[in-house]
Amino acid sequence: MKIALDVMGGDNAPDINVDGAKRALQDFPLIEKIYLVGREETVRSSCDRWGLSGPRVEIVPAAEVVEMNESGLLAVRKKKNSSMSISVDLVKSGDADAVVSAGNTGAAVAAATVKLRLLDGVERAGIVTQLPNEFGVCNVTDTGANPDAKPRHLVGYAVMASILARSVYGKQMPKVGVMSNGSEDEKGTDFTKGTFCLLKHLEERGALPFKFVGNVEGHDLFEHEIDVALTDGFTGNVLLKTCEATAKAFSKWLKEELKANPFRMVGAACASGAFRAMKARLSADSVGGSPLLGVRGVTIIAHGSSTPVAIRNALRVSMEMVQQGVNPLIEEEMARLGTIPEVAEVYPK
């Protein structure tokens, strides 16, 4: 298995990527080779610093870098020799089985969608982000690929994310819900109601490869066994960033309160193990990155502030998706499902 890594992607590139690649190669013998894509001298210097060399790594020169503040689609069109574009090209040519990037999310989505194209039966690609909950993780989709979506697109997201939940996260019959402002069937906007109606219609036909649990609220993602939560890319991205900010704020406030009193500091020292465990549970490092489902090639988009551990785990997730054949399973299930109807075709007004 060969993976292309955009070494210039991320706030702390290239070192976090090179260090992460080294950790992945040490831990996962199934990875035959990692292509380190970026400015050659920069990548080579980083490899020297981290002691990364050998037949399982290959530096692929890329003269340009897509910056975090650039327009995604425009950057892909203008910077054809960027580390991100060339990383995706390696998947397109068949030289790599997957691509991992902690760079500009919009550019990563555009590059993968334009260059790799969509899988058969897929209308829109969607980003799936894992949020920790009492039962492992909740796969939230879409978290940023398509701000404007139609109900039938969310049905496609449901199929793809449920396959990910089953293949990579071990959920034999994933529980899928539509994010709404209440759990009652009639709650929500026309968009969420339409999604609910389509899924209910397909459930009654016995066409769903997962258990549809209806509408779910924000707290359900953390308190109940919801394996996949469906929403549009705008709402999903707001949810994701709110969760990230809340976790950071809670950590900051807790530290401030503990430091305000020496007796609290003594208690904190006694509970240091619990604090470390909680930090690990809330950290995105264990997840690694968010899969972009629906494109012809495994694509993982890591957070811009990823650590080496996160990059290592993003490479792991890409490896597991290739190993489990997630994309062929998506095409197979979408073919079985057939054309997804419009809401008006199922429930005419």
Curated annotation (Swiss-Prot):
Disulfide-bonded cysteine pairs: these are none
What are the GO BP annotations of this UniProt entry?
fatty acid biosynthetic process; phospholipid biosynthetic process
Pathway in which this enzyme or protein is active: Lipid metabolism; phospholipid metabolism
Alphabetical keyword list: Cytoplasm, Lipid biosynthesis, Lipid metabolism, Phospholipid biosynthesis, Phospholipid metabolism, Transferase
Q: Name one GO molecular function term.
A: phosphate:acyl-[acyl carrier protein] acyltransferase activity
Alphabetical list of InterPro entries matching this protein: FA_synthesis, Phospholipid_synth_PlsX-like
Q: Tell me if Cytoplasm is a UniProt keyword of this record.
A: yes
**Any single Gene Ontology cellular-component annotation:** cytoplasm
Question: Could you say which EC number(s) this protein's record lists?
Answer: 2.3.1.274
Identify which top EC class this enzyme belongs to: transferase
Q: Does the keyword Lipid biosynthesis apply?
A: yes
Q: Where in the cell is it found?
A: Cytoplasm
Q: Which reaction does it catalyse?
A: a fatty acyl-[ACP] + phosphate = an acyl phosphate + holo-[ACP]
The record ties this protein, via Pfam families, to: FA_synthesis
Q: Give the highest taxon in the source lineage.
A: Bacteria
Q: How does it assemble?
A: Homodimer. Probably interacts with PlsY.
Q: Which PANTHER family match?
A: FATTY ACID/PHOSPHOLIPID SYNTHESIS PROTEIN PLSX (PTHR30100), PHOSPHATE ACYLTRANSFERASE (PTHR30100:SF1)
The UniProt family comment states: Belongs to the PlsX family.
Any idea what job this protein has?
Answer: Catalyzes the reversible formation of acyl-phosphate (acyl-PO(4)) from acyl-[acyl-carrier-protein] (acyl-ACP). This enzyme utilizes acyl-ACP as fatty acyl donor, but not acyl-CoA.
Return the protein name. Phosphate acyltransferase
Q: Which organism is it from?
A: Akkermansia muciniphila (strain ATCC BAA-835 / DSM 22959 / JCM 33894 / BCRC 81048 / CCUG 64013 / CIP 107961 / Muc)
